[in-house]
Structure formats: C-alpha cells, structure tokens
Amino acid sequence: NGMLSAGDRTFIGDPNPDFTFGFTNNFTYKNWYMDLLVTGSQGGDIYNASRFELEMMDDHKYQSTIVLNRWTTPGDITNVPKANAQNAKLVSDRFIEDGSYIKLKSVTLGYNFAQPFKGVTKLNVYVTGQNLYTWTNYSGFDPEVNAFATTNGVLGIDYGTYPQVRTFVFGLKANF
C-alpha cells in the first residue's frame, strides 16, 4: 500500500560470522626476528546504530551529510528516505552492514644482540604494535563491535562503540 506499518517488520541480519580465523608466524634473519598475528572474520552482520542516529532526521541532533541525498520529490532514486516523523525512527536494513574483516592484530620486531655487555648474558630490544590496520568494507570505526562494549548478548550492534586502541610498546629485555 506504499505505507510502512508494523506489519512490514521482520527479522533482518545475523551477527554470527560464517567463520573466524587467525594466522600467526615468526620470522628470523640473523639476529632479527618478527612475530606476526593476523585475525579476521567472514560474514556476520552489524547493525550500525551510530549511522542510524546520524541519519534519523527526526530531532535536533547533528546529522550526517548523507541525509542531503534523501528522497525529496517523486522520481528521486535514493536509499535515504524522506525526512518525516513517521518513518525516520524505524529500524531499516539500510543500516545492516557486512562485518567481514582482516586485521593486522600484532607485529613485533626485535633484535637480539650477539655480544651483550659485560655482566649481561642476553640483551634484546623490540617494538610491538597492536591493532595496526583493518581491511573491511564496514563504514564504522571497527567491525569488532558489541553495543555499549558489554557482553556478547548484544553482539553485532555498533552504538557508538569505540574502536580498539592502537598501541605501540618499546621494550628492552636483559638477563644478568
């Protein structure tokens, strides 16, 4: 009938990935070494509630520039509905996104000194980076999300979830 109603509602999306994976390896060359961890997930839908808030067009919140592409006149071709109070707050499949990703989770690069100093039997310097890069088509900050950073009971909902922190650690190991 051209009107959205409660009868049009259905379950959409599945937050469970088809599979998850990880790859770890270490490489050595002379006194240098590198440890590597890559993780990922294939499939699994994410409801991007952050986008929902930014594209709702129903209150006085700041809006994303995507709402400039909203439907305004008959004949417009767009996936952004017209701004009105009736349908702006309805959950829509346009906020469901593929949560697949590959993440460079951790890399450590180190050097073992062959001739430690007097009184030092072993000396190693290293740098480790974590959460270095994510390959994904997900439009949010990080596809590893759950609402309000809580339990898996709300898996697959991104409602202002902060991305995982990128960290760098510089270290020195010495045995005396």
Task: Name each model-derived stretch.
Residues 28, 39-41, 128-132, 175:
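Outer-membrane beta-barrel pore domains and translocons
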Residues 36, 125-127, 172:
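Membrane-embedded beta-strand positions of outer-membrane beta-barrel proteins
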Residues 31-36, 116-117:
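Repeated loop/turn-to-beta-strand initiation elements of outer-membrane beta-barrel proteins
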Residues 1-6, 79-93, 147-154:
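Flexible, solvent-exposed coil segments and beta strand-coil junctions
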Residues 64, 75-76, 136-176:
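C-terminal beta-signal and terminal closure region of outer-membrane beta-barrel proteins
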Residues 17-21, 100-105, 164-168:
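Residues that define the transmembrane beta-barrel architecture of outer-membrane proteins
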Residues 1-15, 130-132, 137-140:
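Conserved small-residue
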